[in-house]
């Protein structure tokens, strides 16, 4: 979502609370829970899941491996649920021409650097850069080059923008900030 006026441009950044992350976390949780139940069923010799009799899967090595996969999947699923609940990666980009300041804010993982806040002067911005990598895993990322600081990504790497969309976004931002555009 973007909000613009004559002097201020604010762009809200979606973090890890995306539908795809919810789906993957839910599917991974259910799958790993199933693996763990099958492994536990084979260990106990009881039918905890009614799909098959427990005698079909012996505990060593199949049940043990399935239990391991179930536990590993639960750890990965809990990691995904934590990143979703903490909304890692969300934040905003604020470009203020009146004050001459650019503020970039992102939420990180809990701890010392939970809040990531970067502040730059607009006069230190050298250019808005588009990096394009074509091929099987095509990638188009918009960067802001800061004098003495390097490049700061303004779009997510998994945000699959069309060439037209990324060009339009770069052109609008470069026009707003009054800086040149570079394409790599």
Swiss-Prot record:
Its main location: plastid. The chain crosses the membrane at residues 21-43, 58-80. Keywords: Chloroplast, Membrane, Photosynthesis, Plastid, Thylakoid, Transmembrane, Transmembrane helix. It comes from the Eukaryota. GO terms for cellular component: chloroplast thylakoid membrane; photosystem I. Disulfide bonds: none annotated. It is a multi-pass membrane protein. InterPro entries: PSI_Ycf4_assembly (IPR003359). It is found in: Plastid, Chloroplast thylakoid membrane. The keyword Hydrolase does not apply. GO terms for biological process: photosynthesis. It holds the Pfam family Ycf4. The keyword Chloroplast applies. Seems to be required for the assembly of the photosystem I complex. Belongs to the Ycf4 family. This is Photosystem I assembly protein Ycf4. It comes from Nicotiana tabacum. The gene is ycf4.
């Amino acid at each position: 979502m973007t909000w613009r006026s004559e002097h201020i441009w604010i762009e809200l950044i979606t973090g890890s609370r995306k539908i795809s992350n919810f789906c993957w976390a839910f599917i991974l949780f259910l799958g790993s829970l199933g693996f763990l139940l099958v492994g536990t069923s084979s260990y106990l010799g009881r039918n905890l899941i009614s799909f098959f009799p427990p005698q079909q899967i012996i505990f060593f090595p199949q049940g043990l491996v399935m239990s391991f996969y179930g536990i590993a999947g639960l750890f990965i699923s809990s990691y995904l649920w934590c990143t979703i609940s903490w909304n890692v990666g969300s934040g905003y980009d604020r470009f203020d021409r009146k004050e001459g300041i650019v503020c970039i804010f992102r939420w990180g993982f809990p701890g010392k650097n939970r809040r990531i806040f970067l502040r730059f002067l607009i006069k230190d911005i050298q250019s808005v850069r588009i990096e394009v990598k074509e091929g099987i895993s095509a990638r188009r990322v918009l960067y802001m080059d800061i004098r003495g600081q390097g490049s700061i990504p303004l779009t997510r790497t998994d945000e699959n923008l069309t060439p037209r969309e990324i060009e339009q976004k770069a052109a609008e931002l470069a026009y707003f900030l009054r800086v040149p555009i570079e394409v790599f």
